[in-house]
Amino acid sequence: MSRRCELTAKGPQVGHKVSHSNIKTKRRFLPNLCNVTFISDALGRNVRLRVSTNAIKSVDHNGGLDAYLLKANAATLSPRALELKRAIEKKAAEAAPVAKAS
């Protein structure tokens, strides 16, 4: 399991640990990842993802997982999140009323 957010693609960064005597040694800054269960209204089921705390705030701000995934850039999403996005788009297209030509 990689240390990468499934929604925002945040991953580890590299920097220095600096001692009192200013000696620099390499270290990794790991993202704050949580296993979170989101509710998808369009799919009608729960979805468990490994996301950063920043992504949790973004999902809440956008009004839920469905709205966030519809707005999200496909390049930043994991393969699992891309499958969810496509499934949500498909359900949304089915639910939308078909325009009648008159």
Swiss-Prot record:
GO cellular component term, pick one: cytosolic large ribosomal subunit
InterPro entries, alphabetized: Ribosomal_bL28, Ribosomal_bL28/bL31-like_sf, Ribosomal_bL28_bact-type, Ribosomal_bL28_sf
Annotated GO biological process: translation
Ribonucleoprotein found in the keyword field: yes
Protein name per its UniProtKB record: Large ribosomal subunit protein bL28
Pfam families (UniProt xref): Ribosomal_L28 (PF00830)
Region (Disordered) location: 1-20
Organism: Bradyrhizobium sp. (strain BTAi1 / ATCC BAA-1182)
Any GO molecular function: structural constituent of ribosome
HAMAP family the record matches: Ribosomal_bL28
Domain of life, per lineage: Bacteria
Gene behind this protein: rpmB
